[in-house]
């Protein structure tokens, strides 16, 4: 029983196992239960706001390789610049940030924050140094613009290009889109050496070491979601490059060369924690019906470099509960004692009550392991018709941070853990609060059957089906009204002492069985019975006299 995480939801916590190369909360103990990773699940759920999806499919953000560059002190006299560069999986722009001028120059959706530097960030000679600092680029990148919505990102998108300032039209970058080293971002596996050569100066566009922070701006405007990049970057190892830019003369012209060599690859892993999970498979989003389907998908809590981008990733979370109309084969009782007394009275006094439909509130709480989620998901996909069916923390950080930075990082991780725990406890408390407010049938434990009568005219099955799918449109108001009615019915039952009705029935039944009551009844009717007997005897005597008289008259007439 899951619901998709949408672009209107607050960012969720995504934990990585390496605090040196990827910013954000870290946890190298995930997954909590490796044996349950990859459990099969079939889903068919609805949505109201666009869901968050990653992969090569309509409605999902596409993956791509992105580069981050820092400049380090030059040691060679022939080198103009010396670089360290990191390449990793990121989010693919729909159009280049320099190609869409309407979005580029629009400041309507520009976030508040530090502007990205105009110069390439400086670093140390250590190749394992990459200091992340969030900043806002001068132009925006469009990640998606279709019927599923418009999603943008204001993070810098670094790339090498030719500086054609003062050059002729023969410069390769005289067009709107500068010449980008496409081979550099083609693969993270095949190429370990890159050489860029040109008679024109190589420069780095969109400076800054900042992570993508996509957000939706149409049809609604939602918060930024920086956690998506931490999922994407862990789907493949990151590659570390080191190199320099040299200047020489060819044909009496300056000739620029950039040599980059890969010296290190770093595997990563990113994880989410309950109640959030990752559905991986052939996910299909249907905007016309606002539904998401996926057959033979798998449930994960972690993504690593073995991920296959032929699949898609859908972020989901466990649902706290739902309302389902069901039929019961016996009357609703609040406790087993009432049930026993009712059965006794039914046998002794031949009294019965009839309940046709009730509403069942499935209080599932938070799904703590993926196994529970898989079973609940399959159950939701199959049928919902009856009561029986429903039934190392800072690894290698000293090489990058000083002692104070390390302490800050540990505190930040603990705060993120605390925040995630508080969110989990808050959802759990809300579930328990709702459960305590309900008056439930005694014969169920994992869910609650309320005494509210199901009104098919107010909540027809199509509304129930959309509620089960998780579509939060106008049905939300109807469900809220239904909850109020159920809580009112529960309060009405709580105003009575438990078992009062049954005990009153027992008292009435025992009163009817009291012999004294029977004697009083006989005394009160004895006189009437005697009078009736006398009347009957008188009538009988009269009939007899009449019969005898008739016989005498007949004998006289027939005499001699």
Swiss-Prot record:
This is Endogenous retrovirus group K member 18 Env polyprotein. The record marks 354-355 as: Cleavage. Retroviral envelope proteins mediate receptor recognition and membrane fusion during early infection. Endogenous envelope proteins may have kept, lost or modified their original function during evolution. This envelope protein has superantigenic properties. It comes from the Eukaryota. Keywords: Cell membrane, Cleavage on pair of basic residues, Disulfide bond, ERV, Membrane, Transmembrane, Transmembrane helix, Transposable element, Viral envelope protein, Virion. Belongs to the beta type-B retroviral envelope protein family. HERV class-II K(HML-2) env subfamily. Expressed at higher level in the thymus. Expressed at lower level in peripheral blood lymphocytes. The surface (SU) and transmembrane (TM) proteins form a heterodimer. SU and TM are attached by noncovalent interactions or by a labile interchain disulfide bond. Orthologs in P.troglodytes and G.gorilla. Induction: Induced by type I interferons and by Epstein-Barr virus (EBV). Specific enzymatic cleavages in vivo yield the mature SU and TM proteins. The chain crosses the membrane at residues 522-542. It comes from Homo sapiens (Human).
């Amino acid at each position: 029983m899951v619901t998709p995480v949408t672009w209107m939801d607050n960012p969720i916590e995504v934990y990585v196992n390496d605090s040196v190369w990827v910013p954000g909360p870290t946890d190298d103990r995930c997954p909590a239960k490796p044996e349950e990773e990859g459990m099969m699940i079939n889903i068919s759920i609805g949505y109201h706001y666009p869901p968050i999806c990653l992969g090569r499919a309509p409605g999902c953000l596409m993956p791509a390789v992105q580069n981050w560059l820092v400049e380090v002190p030059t040691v060679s006299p022939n080198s103009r610049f010396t670089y360290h560069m990191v390449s990793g999986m990121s989010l693919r722009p729909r159009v280049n940030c320099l190609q869409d001028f309407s979005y580029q120059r629009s400041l309507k959706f520009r976030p508040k924050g530090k502007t990205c530097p105009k110069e390439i960030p400086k670093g140390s000679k250590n190749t394992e140094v990459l200091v992340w600092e969030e900043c806002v680029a001068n132009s925006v990148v469009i990640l998606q613009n279709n019927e599923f919505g418009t999603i943008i990102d204001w993070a810098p998108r670094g790339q090498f290009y030719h500086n054609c300032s003062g050059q002729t039209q023969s410069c390769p970058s005289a067009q709107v889109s500068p010449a980008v080293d496409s081979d550099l971002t083609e693969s993270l596996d095949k190429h370990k050496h890159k050489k860029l050569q040109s008679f024109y100066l190589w420069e780095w566009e969109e400076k800054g070491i900042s992570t993508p922070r996509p957000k939706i701006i149409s049809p609604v405007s939602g918060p930024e979601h920086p956690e998506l990049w931490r999922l994407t970057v862990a789907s493949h190892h990151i590659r570390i490059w080191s190199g320099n830019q040299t200047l020489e003369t060819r044909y009496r012209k300056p000739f620029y060369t950039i040599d980059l060599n890969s010296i290190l690859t770093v595997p990563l892993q990113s994880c989410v924690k309950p109640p959030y999970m990752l559905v991986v498979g052939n996910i299909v989003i249907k905007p016309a019906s606002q539904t998401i389907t996926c057959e033979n998908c798998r449930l994960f809590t972690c993504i690593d470099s073995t991920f296959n981008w032929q699949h898609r990733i859908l972020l989901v979370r466990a649902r706290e509960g739902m309302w389902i109309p069901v039929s019961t084969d016996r009357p609703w009782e609040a406790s087993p004692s009432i049930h026993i007394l009712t059965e006794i009275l039914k046998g002794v006094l031949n009294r019965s009550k009839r309940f046709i439909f009730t509403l069942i509130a499935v209080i599932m709480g938070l799904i703590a392991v993926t196994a529970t989620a898989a079973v609940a998901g399959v159950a939701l996909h199959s049928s919902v018709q009856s009561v029986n069916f429903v039934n190392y923390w800072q690894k290698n950080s000293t090489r990058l941070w000083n002692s104070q930075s390390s302490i800050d990082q540990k505190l930040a991780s603990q705060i993120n853990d605390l925040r995630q725990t508080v969110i989990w406890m808050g959802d759990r408390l809300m579930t328990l609060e709702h459960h305590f407010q309900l008056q439930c049938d005694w014969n169920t434990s994992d869910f609650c059957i309320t005494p509210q009568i199901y009104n098919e005219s107010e909540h027809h099955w199509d509304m129930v089906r959309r509620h089960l799918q998780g579509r939060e449109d106008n049905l939300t108001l109807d469900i809220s009204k239904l909850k109020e009615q159920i809580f009112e019915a529960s309060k009405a039952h709580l105003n009575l002492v438990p078992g009062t009705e049954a005990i009153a029935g027992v008292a009435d039944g025992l009163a009817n069985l009291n012999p004294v009551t029977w004697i009083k009844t006989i005394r009160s009717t004895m006189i009437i019975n005697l009078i009736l007997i006398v009347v009957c005897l008188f009538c009988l005597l009269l009939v007899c006299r009449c019969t005898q008289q008739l016989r005498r008259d007949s004998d006289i007439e027939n005499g001699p």
